[in-house]
Regions:
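Bacterial N-terminal signal peptides that target proteins for export
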Residues: 2-9
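Bacterial Sec-pathway N-terminal export signals of envelope proteins
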Residues: 22-95, 202, 283-313, 363, ...
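Short, solvent-exposed, mixed-charge loop/turn linkers that connect secondary-structure elements
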Residues: 34, 210-213, 230-232, 251-299, ...
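Extracytoplasmic loops and strand-loop junctions of Gram-negative outer membrane beta-barrel proteins
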Residues: 49-52, 129-136, 341-343
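Small/polar (Gly/Ser/Thr/Ala-rich) solvent-exposed segments
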Residues: 78, 101-121, 135-142, 153-182, ...
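Amphipathic alpha-helical coiled-coil segments
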Residues: 80-94, 183, 187-209, 217-224, ...
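Hydrophobic, lipid-facing positions within transmembrane beta-strands of outer-membrane proteins
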Residues: 146-152, 294, 354-360
């Protein structure tokens, strides 16, 4: 018997080794291309702002309160939280797959065995034996069978298939959490962008109202000049048309304010309400991001990069699990409980019955399917790596572009300030010249149009600077968790 056992084990070992020789090799996880030491040639060493919380980044109390409200009530954040629960449930299921499964059962049956069946002959012969007690005699018409107990089964994870599937689920759970962090950062920046857009629109209304007052006064002056013969009806109509155009623009801006307020209310999950806000766009109210950090910190702080990394690790674990599927599966099973054909003796300790089973199975005619699964998992690992590298490249270039935009927009702001100041003086001069007949009404109209255009351009440049600073905060990983 010992020789037979040795032969069996030897044959089993040879079978496993032969299977192992045919198992494909997995590809190691690739490393992303190294990032440069700095974003620009002029950038120096600095401290990252990625860990700067939005409450410290934005100094506007109304904006901070609005962001808090959005994060607490936005429907997308609640959806993301539910998705995290789903990913956590998948992870728990994978963890449970490594443990034995145990079930409790109760079974009762009755069987009539024919006289020419093995069971029928055996039961008849047993009842004739003098070695059994009366309680052990088997009913022959209907043979009952009662069973109450526990059954257990366990797949032993020798090759790491279940462990790698668990690891894949864990990495995807972490990727889902990063997705929620990415959503949080997006909500913060979107809320702040709309908020500053709203302030800009408020200021635009103020600028238009100021210009309407100026145009009213100019119109009255032209009417007076017409009465004394120094201006024509055409001049009056031109000033009147310009005033009507400015008023129409004002109504359009007010509609934009309503639309922007409604967008913010939508973010908060509200139907109605008001948006409390400051009266001016103050760039100093946003912490300037001169300390934009080292590019390598993107890998640590950007939630989209972290999510892509976890997806890469999950795909590698899937490939390892697909490879492990080529190896034999080892299963253990056991039962323990009470079993008897005599109901009166069912709870007697002598009715305790146990069973222990062990089995091993190896794939033979399934290898095309297994190989296909492995090839798919390997290709998905490559795709995950390329997505990871792509995400890093996109993040780096995004920061470079925003830093360049900030630098150029500062120069734009400086020139726009000069333009507005010059055009403001130009309006005063044109009015004085018109009164003294050294300028025509057309020059006044042109000066007023240029001034209002310059005022709005300066306002939009300030808004753009605020928006790009907000986007840079997000691009560096700020606001994410």
């Amino acid at each position: 018997m010992k020789i037979n056992n040795n032969k069996f084990l030897s044959a089993l070992a040879v079978s496993i080794l032969s299977i192992g020789c045919a198992v494909p090799k997995t590809t190691a996880v690739k490393q992303a291309a190294p990032l440069p030491d700095q974003y620009t040639q002029t950038a120096g060493d600095s401290i990252s702002v990625a860990r700067l919380q939005f409450r410290n980044f934005f100094n506007d109390k109304h904006l901070v309160a609005l962001i808090d409200h959005v994060l607490a009530h936005n429907l997308d954040t609640r959806i993301a939280a539910a998705q995290i629960k789903i990913a956590d449930a998948y992870l728990e299921a994978r963890r449970g797959a490594l443990l034995p499964s145990v079930t409790a059962g109760l079974r009762a049956s009755g069987t009539h065995y024919g006289k020419h069946t093995m069971e029928g002959v055996g039961n008849f012969d047993t009842n004739l034996s003098s070695n059994i007690e009366n309680s052990q005699r088997i009913p022959t018409v209907i043979t009952p069978d009662y069973w109450l107990g526990l059954s257990a089964s366990w797949e032993i994870d020798l090759w790491g298939k279940l462990g790698n599937l668990q690891q894949a689920a864990r990495e995807r759970f972490l990727a889902t959490r990063q997705g929620k962090d990415l959503l949080t950062a997006a909500l913060i920046t979107h809320t702040a962008t709309l908020y500053y857009e709203l302030i800009m629109l408020d200021r635009e209304v103020a600028i238009l109202n100021e210009n309407i007052e100026l145009q009213h006064r100019a119109l009255e002056i032209v009417k007076i000049h017409k009465e004394v013969g120094r201006a024509t009806e055409l001049a009056v109509q031109q000033f009147d048309a310009q005033l009507a155009n400015t008023k129409a623009t004002l109504y359009g801006v007010r509609q934009e304010i309503t639309a922007t307020e409604n967008k913010l209310l939508e973010l908060t999950g509200s139907y109605t309400g008001t948006v409390e806000r400051s009266t001016t766009i103050d760039i100093k109210a946003i912490r300037y991001l001169a300390e934009h950090g080292h590019p390598q910190q993107l890998l640590q702080y950007r939630p989209d990069i972290r999510a892509a990394y976890h997806e890469l690790q999950a795909s590698h674990a899937d490939a390892l699990a697909a490879r492990a599927a080529f190896f034999p599966t080892v299963n253990l099973a056991a039962t323990a409980g009470l079993q008897s054909f005599n109901a009166a003796q069912f709870f007697n300790p002598t009715s305790i019955a146990t069973q222990l089973l062990g089995g091993i199975s190896a794939p033979v005619f399934q290898k095309k399917q297994l190989k296909a699964n492995f090839n798919i998992a390997t290709a998905e690992q490559e795709i995950a790596f390329l997505n990871y590298q792509k995400t890093i490249n996109k993040a780096f270039q995004e920061v470079r572009t925003l830093l360049s935009y900030i630098d150029n927009n500062e120069k734009i702001l400086a020139e726009k300030h000069k333009e507005v100041e010059a055009l403001g003086k130009g309006i005063e001069v044109s009015n004085d010249l018109y009164v003294t007949a050294y300028a025509t009404y057309l020059e006044i109209i042109a000066a007023q149009k240029s001034k209002i255009t310059a005022d709005l351009d300066l306002l939009k440049a300030r808004r753009d600077q605020a928006h790009v600073l907000i986007q840079l905060y997000k691009a560096l990983g700020g606001g994410a968790g």
